[in-house]
């Protein structure tokens, strides 16, 4: 906890529901009052079947000037064409976010990742919101 930011119990609880019960497609976390990581948004929409649908939905729930952490459970096609669910941790640090906020999120990220267990890959996205979908899709398909 280098930054002094705590992780709420709800963050871990909701992550476990995503990982074990597959109740959520993704979770968006935010840092509240520079003190604690909390759940900002939970997505349970069963109509989001593909990783493309999930990425678009995530993008629609982000803001151009605010950092966020996202955990997404996405069905990714293997080279053999089989879908495998993978849990990604995404640190969203948009170009237009304030420097102080970027530093706080960057210094708190590892503590959150250590509190949860079962992440396939940890990613950092720093592009503009309009490029988020393409950037994330490219990274995911190349992992």
From Swiss-Prot:
It is found in: Cytoplasm; Cytoplasm, Cytoskeleton. GO terms for biological process: actin cytoskeleton organization; actin filament depolymerization; actin polymerization or depolymerization; cytoplasmic actin-based contraction involved in cell motility. GO terms for molecular function: actin filament binding; actin monomer binding. It comes from the Eukaryota. The keyword Phosphoprotein does not apply. Residues 4-141 form the ADF-H domain. Keywords: Actin-binding, Cytoplasm, Cytoskeleton. CDD domains: ADF_cofilin_like. GO terms for cellular component: actin cytoskeleton; cytoplasm. Gene3D superfamilies: Severin. Belongs to the actin-binding proteins ADF family. Interacts with monomeric actin, does not bind to actin polymers. Not involved in actin polymerisation, instead functions to stimulate nucleotide exchange on monomeric actin and influence turnover of the small amount of cytosolic actin microfilaments. Essential for erythrocytic schizogony. This is Cofilin/actin-depolymerizing factor homolog 2. It comes from Plasmodium falciparum (isolate 3D7).
């Amino acid at each position: 906890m280098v930054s002094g930011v705590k992780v709420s119990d709800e963050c871990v609880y909701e992550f476990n529901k995503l990982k074990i019960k597959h109740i959520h497609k993704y979770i968006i976390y935010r840092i509240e009052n520079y003190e604690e990581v909390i759940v900002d948004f939970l997505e349970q929409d069963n109509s989001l079947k593909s990783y493309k649908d999930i990425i678009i939905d995530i993008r629609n729930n982000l803001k151009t000037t605010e950092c966020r952490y996202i955990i997404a459970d996405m069905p990714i096609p293997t080279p053999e064409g089989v879908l495998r669910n993978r849990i990604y941790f995404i640190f969203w640090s948009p170009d237009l976010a304030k420097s102080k906020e970027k530093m706080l999120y960057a210094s708190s990220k590892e503590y959150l990742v250590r509190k949860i267990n079962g992440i396939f890959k940890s990613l950092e996205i720093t592009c503009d919101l309009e490029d988020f979908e393409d950037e994330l899709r490219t990274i995911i398909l190349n992992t």
